[in-house]
Amino acid sequence: MGAEQVDAIVVGAGLAGSATAWALARRGRSVAVLEAFGPGHRRGSSHGTARIFRRAYPDPLYVRLTGAAHRLWRRLADEAGEEFVLRTGGLDYGPARQAEKMYDILRAHGVAAELMPAAAAAERWPGVVFGDDPVLFHPDAGVIDPERAMAAMRRLAAAAGAEIFYETAVVRLSATPGGAVVDAVGRSWRAPVVIVAAGPWLEPLLGGLVRLPPLAVEQVAAFHFAPLTPAWNGAPPTPTFIRYSEIVLYGVPAGRDGEAPGAIKVGEHGHGRITTGDDRDGIVDSAARERATAFVRDGLRGLDPAPVGELTCLYTSTASDDFILDRQGPFVICSACSGHGAKFAPLTGEIAADLACGGAPPDHRFTLAAHGR
């Protein structure tokens, strides 16, 4: 049987791939989405019910992009008829967090924020031990529900004509004079453009076709901790938080995955075990568990320091932690979210759709050239 012809092929149906399919289908393109596993699988980087949405970055580029992403999250909610971002506010603190710099950048971009002494923050959020450094709070931060968001984006894409194929692992990508052919077991597709949003499988799929920069795939761990009292951190909602010290730790209300009412998901940003998409074992590192438990015991009053649940996730990172959003020939590279890409998902999909339709990358920093390729 010959290859099926479509306008665009999306490889990977995680957050970035689902968002890309939604964006392309809205533009009237015929789209085939190829996902190696089933819906809601936990093999990659997009699963679960809790990721942080935040505007606070020590980098003006990302602050601007979070604003654009926020507008697209709103559009998704309006089109799907449900909410995907719970607004909680967010705290940034710790000796390495650059709270003053981030406050100045947020205010310069018109983003509401407060910078306060640690003692004042402790009065408002008594469950957090802030130390001595200034604390940044911005009310627009919140919690993303990736599982519901991906399902909604795929549902909207399908309603606009996209076809989504689960359990369809790509075995070969081939460039052709008119675009590319994508082969799966027993079936092939042909399109002028292929968007590869495959996270840790990016290099195995594209390594022989596109000169990619070095990418690190890490298996990182996160843990769920139950509150000892419902109001452990003052009046609800509990804000997200990031503590920057020798090791970066974050916390976020865990949502449906929390395994206890009001559970908080706590994890390290990075410090994972190097692996690949196929080789990850899902085994939680005991040293990471000990560090998270110590942080909760010493830094989060009111949480039981014995975790009630734990999970692993994959980061695929560039050396700079900037994304790769670029096109080379018929291939759009939409990946390497470096552990901070969930909040940008609908914007990432919009940018990938722009690239697929002949547009330019939104910033030179996201190009292959900027990554040394």
Regions found by a protein language model. Name each.
Residues 2-16, 32:
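Beta1/beta-strand and adjacent pyrophosphate-binding region of the FAD-binding site
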Residues 50-124, 132-133, 248:
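Dinucleotide-binding Rossmann-like beta1-alpha1 core, especially the glycine-rich loop
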Residues 22-26, 83-85, 188, 200-329:
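Active-site substrate-recognition segment that forms the wall
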Residues 171-189:
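Conserved beta-strand-loop-beta-strand element in the redox core of flavoprotein oxidoreductases
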Residues 9-11, 34, 189-201, 349:
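Short hydrophobic core segments
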Residues 25-46:
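Glycine-rich FAD pyrophosphate-binding loop
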Residues 95-166, 172-176:
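Flavin (FAD/FMN) cofactor-binding and adjacent substrate-gating region
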Residues 292-373:
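C-terminal catalytic lobe of FAD-dependent flavoproteins
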